[in-house]
Structures are given as C-alpha cells and as structure tokens.
C-alpha cells in the first residue's frame, strides 16, 4: 500500500480497490483495520514520520555523544539530519505534502514514542528559552509546517530553492527563535 500512496498524486490518492488488490486482501479485511483510505494514509505517514524523527534523533545523539553544546547547534544538527532523511527518502514526500496538520496532531497525541519524546524535548527547550507552553507549541507547529512544505518542492523539484538553501534558512530561523529573550523581543 505504501507504494501506491507515494507514487501517485497527493491530490488523487489511490482507491480502496487499488489498495486491497495490491495487498491481496478482501475489502472487508481492509475495513477491519481502517475506517477509510485516509486513516491508512495517516498510519503510513505516522510510520514514516516516526522513522524520520528516530533516524534524525539517533544521528544527532551520536554526533554530540559526550560533548556539551548550545541548544541552537543541537536543534540545527537535528534539522540537518531531517533534511538528510528527506533527501534520501524522496518517495516519502508525496505522503507528507498537505499533511502538516495531521503531523502536528500525531505529535500531540504521542502515539509513537519517538514523536512524543521529540515533541516533549522541543517544548522543554523552548520553555527553557523563556517561551510559554502555548508559544512553545506554536513555534513547533510553525517549524514543522515550514519544514514539511518547503522541503517537498525543494527535494523533489529543486525549486524554487535548493534543499541546502532551505536548510540554511531554517538554521537562521532556529537561531533567532532560541536567541536570548532580550534579543528576540521586538515590536511589530
């Protein structure tokens, strides 16, 4: 089923008939496990998202093993590892496109331990930098939204900007978000 959702258009996901035919199961069996194809898409997305987060966390922890570093460097290294995963798993991107709200809800529900841990760590990080819990959660949502939407076109088509350019822009944004409170307070 994964190949059906990653090879087609995000605007026209495969039909239930296509899914059950490829999986070699009856429609009734499909409906025992999933309410509809969108629930299946959410499950596939959650699995790939957890794989991405787990891979990025593992590489980040390896990179900083036994070393002290500042929070911005740690988050930027994590984001670099997410970009590496995206670059190596482009087939996953059609599943990601337009699924930011689902991604955020899944992180909040914490159905996957990796997502729950990563989300909790990010909230604590922002709290330590003077943000309220509400502001911390909003910052995470904005980062996830930007990361997923801009990385899809950049990774698949190389436009309007290359993935490396997007990565550097995200790093600057993280550095600003994690700057001292006095440095980031501004009037709009």
Predicted regions and their residues:
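Hydrophobic/aromatic-rich alpha-helical bundle segments in the mid-to-C-terminal region
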Residues: 126-173, 184-188
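Helix-turn-helix
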Residues: 7-39, 43-44
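Short hydrophobic clusters on alpha-helical segments that form packing/core surfaces
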Residues: 1-5, 82
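Amphipathic alpha-helical segments used for helix-helix packing
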Residues: 81-105, 123, 149-156
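Amphipathic alpha-helical packing segments from all-alpha helical-bundle domains
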Residues: 54-57, 85, 103-130, 137-141, ...
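Short, basic, alpha-helical segments at the C-terminal edge of helix-turn-helix-like DNA-binding modules
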Residues: 16, 45-58
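Short, hydrophobic secondary-structure boundary micro-motifs
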Residues: 13, 93-97, 135, 186-187
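Hydrophobic alpha-helical connector segments
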Residues: 43, 58-87, 143
């Amino acid at each position: 089923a994964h190949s059906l959702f990653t090879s087609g258009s995000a605007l026209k996901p495969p039909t239930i008939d296509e899914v059950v035919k490829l999986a070699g199961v009856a429609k009734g069996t499909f409906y025992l496990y999933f309410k509809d194809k969108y629930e299946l898409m959410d499950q596939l997305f959650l699995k790939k998202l957890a794989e991405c987060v787990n891979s990025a966390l593992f590489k980040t922890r390896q990179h900083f093993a036994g070393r002290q570093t500042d929070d911005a460097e740690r988050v930027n290294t994590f984001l670099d590892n997410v970009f590496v995963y995206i670059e190596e798993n482009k087939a996953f991107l059609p599943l990601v496109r337009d699924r930011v709200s689902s991604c955020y809800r899944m992180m909040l529900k914490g159905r996957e331990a990796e997502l729950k841990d990563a989300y909790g760590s990010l909230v604590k990080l922002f709290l330590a930098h003077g943000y309220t819990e509400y502001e911390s959660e909003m910052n995470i949502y904005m980062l996830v939204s930007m990361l997923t939407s801009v990385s899809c076109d950049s990774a698949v088509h190389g436009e309007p900007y290359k993935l490396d350019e997007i990565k550097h822009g995200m790093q600057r944004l993280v550095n600003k978000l994690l700057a001292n409170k006095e440095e980031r307070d501004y009037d709009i």
